[in-house]
Amino acid sequence: DIVYHLAGITDVAYVKKDSNVQQDEKIKTIAIDGTRNVLNSIHKKCKLIFPSTHVIYEGIKETKKNIEENEKPCPILAYSSSKAQNEKEIRESKKNYVILRLGSVYGYSTDTMRINIMPNLFSKIASLNGTISLFSGGKQIKSLAPLIDVARCMKFMGESKKINNETFNLTKESVTVKEVAEICKKINPKMSIKTTEDETPNLGYTLSNKKLLKTGFK
């Protein structure tokens, strides 16, 4: 059997000023108790595919590129903290697992919660001839992952007999927020871009996908 554990709250704060205690508790309860329920329910021969997140590194104070899987997590907010806790408990469970640390996932979805992800939000604004705001000038660097590649990789990991009890970064490209906005501008010149001094959680970081590519996934 294969279990793809996708349950979780995605309507989350991206900076401290946007968080609130009630929502944070809900995020943690669904993530931590929910994952424990999954671990307690599956048998030893079952393979668990778990999507974690790049934001477990949101506490990095300086720009860091090509972070590898053995880098110590430094979560701050409820969502990233609960994902880091999930990873720890999955590893300690003695169940068969593959953890995929996703970059910012972009692509078509009927889930409106995912519109808040930067590349999806910028695409929506561009389609409406709107204005993209670049917080802190758009200098933040991010690793992105196309939705189709996430689905392909989950299938690949679930079906692989050789890959067990491993953690992988799942990303395709790394770009600055400003570069994403400029791509949108090229596609739709009618939209506009402005810079602001709004808060960003960090200066950005990127994940290395070398370990993943060594498995044969393309």
Where would I find each of the regions flagged by the language model?
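Helix N-cap/beta-alpha junction loops of NAD(P)-dependent oxidoreductase domains
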Residues: 10-15, 58-60, 108
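NAD(P)H-binding glycine-rich loop region in Rossmannoid oxidoreductase-like domains
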Residues: 1-30
